[in-house]
A protein has these predicted regions:
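Short, membrane-interfacial amphipathic segments enriched in basic
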Residues: 191-212
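Transmembrane helical segments that form the transport core of multi-pass membrane transport proteins
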Residues: 219-267, 275
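Transmembrane helix-loop-helix hairpins in multi-pass inner-membrane proteins
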Residues: 1-36, 87-198, 277, 281-340
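Membrane-embedded helical hairpins/re-entrant loop segments and their flanking transmembrane helices
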Residues: 59-85, 89, 247-264
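Membrane-interface helix starts
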Residues: 6-10, 40-49, 217-231
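Hydrophobic alpha-helical transmembrane segments
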Residues: 46-50, 77, 81-82, 118, ...
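A short amphipathic helical element positioned immediately N-terminal to and/or at the very start
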Residues: 32-38, 208-221
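Alpha-helical transmembrane segments of multi-pass integral membrane proteins
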Residues: 49-56, 87-91, 128, 232-236, ...
Length: 340
């Protein structure tokens, strides 16, 4: 138990250290300006950002609870909150590979079979992506003229990113809800090389996709869950998209109003969904600077980015470490009790 806990601390510490080093290397040219800007941020401002960051995770938990209640009505908000933070921990420390297993194992301990757990998490992911697309579409319709007039060169690339992101969301939704799309993907998998190694991979991927499709449909095709899930997700995204605006204001940028910051933030999340990342790092930082730097100098935008990532990445990760260690301790106690 102590060795596992020590390993968890080590992995968590190394993850944060590597990300911190990466931030220093990326922003080394403007680091003195960033430090200066951050030193002017009031303590209440930091608390506000952390509160918004936690509120986003709490709303994610509400979405999770809406879906879980379809399968297990006696699950509570605390259960959903733990599932959410286990997902945060798994995404960062295992580079995404352990996210679903960690969440599904917790749900299994709460009485849900593994298939139902995977279906719940896949459904939550799809509803989130659909909501991201809806929010960005509405924001673009309302603020597209302003974006075209104030940054015509950037708007062209954003439109391309929007189209790519939208296609990915639509394809993902159809994969989980329409058997014909699943059959098409399985047929494409059949085109992979026929060697023992690739045969094993193909079978594993095909089984996983088939199970996810079967379980996700049980949730996503229920109208009440779709409506409630998307409604909660839109509120959740409103909270998330408020953080860049707050961060920019705290470091002195007043060039963007609230609605404009919401538009840019919604496009940022949609575009980054189409880009590969490692432990949730990379595309978000690039997109943040790409979208917000035109209305603030590089140092100001970089300072706001640091605040944004503290609220949406570092703080939730620290909370997720606490949740993971508590759940690991409970699991070990249960295992030892069964062994005795």
């Amino acid at each position: 138990m102590k060795s596992k806990r020590s390993r968890t601390y080590l992995v968590s510490g190394l993850t944060l250290a590597l990300i911190f080093v990466a931030i220093i290397l990326v922003f080394r040219d403007v680091l003195p300006d960033i430090v200066k800007d951050l030193s002017t941020v009031p303590f209440w401002g930091v608390l506000l950002l952390l509160a918004l960051g936690f509120a986003y995770e709490a709303m994610e938990s509400v979405l999770c609870l809406v879906i879980i209640h379809h399968k297990k009505p006696d699950c509570t908000f605390i259960d959903a909150l733990r599932v959410t933070f286990l997902g945060v921990f798994g995404n960062i420390t295992t580079l995404g590979a352990g996210t679903l297993p960690m969440q599904s194992f917790y749900l299994y301990r709460r009485g849900l079979d593994a298939g139902s757990g995977l279906g719940i998490m896949a459904s939550e992911y799809v509803l989130h992506k659909i909501s991201v697309l809806i929010y960005a579409t509405v924001a673009l319709l309302l603020g597209g003229d302003w974006l075209e007039q104030s940054a015509s060169g950037l708007a062209r690339y954003l439109l391309i990113g929007y189209v790519i992101g939208a296609l990915i969301v639509i394809a993902l939704t159809l994969l989980y809800t329409w058997d014909k799309v699943l059959k098409l993907v399985l047929m494409l998998l059949g085109k992979l090389p026929h060697t023992p190694k690739w045969d094993e991979r193909r079978e594993k991927w095909a089984n996983s996709l088939t199970e996810l499709n079967r379980e996700a449909k049980k949730v996503l095709l229920v109208p009440s869950i779709r409506v409630k899930g998307i409604a909660v997700s839109l509120v959740k995204l409103f909270v998330l998209y408020s953080i860049p605006y707050a961060a920019l204001r705290l470091v002195g940028c007043t060039a963007l109003n609230f609605a404009q910051a919401q538009l840019l933030a919604s496009l940022m999340l949609l575009i980054t969904s189409a880009l590969p990342n490692v432990a949730g790092v990379g595309p978000m930082e690039f997109a943040f600077l790409l979208l917000f730097a035109p209305w603030a100098d590089t140092a100001i935008a970089s300072s706001a980015l640091v605040l944004y990532r503290v609220a949406t990445y570092f703080f939730p990760f620290l909370l997720s470490v606490i949740v993971f260690l508590r759940e690991e301790k409970k699991s070990l106690k249960g295992f030892n009790a069964q062994s005795a």
